[in-house]
């Protein structure tokens, strides 16, 4: 199949990488696994055995007229432990490489179908100036965009760093969430070739 290149001749690309069917279930699984992997998982609260004190019973068992109490650190008490206290846990979800690559192929194919993938010969800025990048993106009619190149250009990265709806990634740094989070994905021809190598 062919991909149109902005201001240049169309290029021949792999049908498998850029023209496959959209597998919503697989993409959802990849996104959930990616987001789960980003969770810190260090949240911890104290249950009744973790809080200090509460060893001595507050009052004797019988004769006070009050309800019996064996500790002052139960969940019903002020200063007591939490009933179902959160514990540190690992939220990682296993996703096979084959499934992950298939999800990326599915996303790229859907971006092409929705005309959200903008291919350019090359994309760079002369100096790390946000103004020049905004001007360049404006010329292409882009504002909410992920820029993917085969290798991250330092000037481009610094110029985009202060823009809230612009991100710069290389091919290896692209993930399912970033690829679907933006209105458009601006990708260079070398990056397209690299995606084909990795996912083909």
UniProtKB/Swiss-Prot annotation:
Molecular function terms, GO-annotated: rRNA binding; structural constituent of ribosome
Keyword Phosphoprotein carried by entry: no
Record-level GO BP terms: translation
A GO cellular-component term linked to this record: ribosome
Keyword field contains Transport: no
Pfam families per record: Ribosomal_L4
Entry keywords, A to Z: Ribonucleoprotein, Ribosomal protein, RNA-binding, rRNA-binding
Transmembrane segments: none
Protein family per UniProt: Belongs to the universal ribosomal protein uL4 family.
Function statement: One of the primary rRNA binding proteins, this protein initially binds near the 5'-end of the 23S rRNA. It is important during the early stages of 50S assembly. It makes multiple contacts with different domains of the 23S rRNA in the assembled 50S subunit and ribosome. Forms part of the polypeptide exit tunnel.
Protein name: Large ribosomal subunit protein uL4
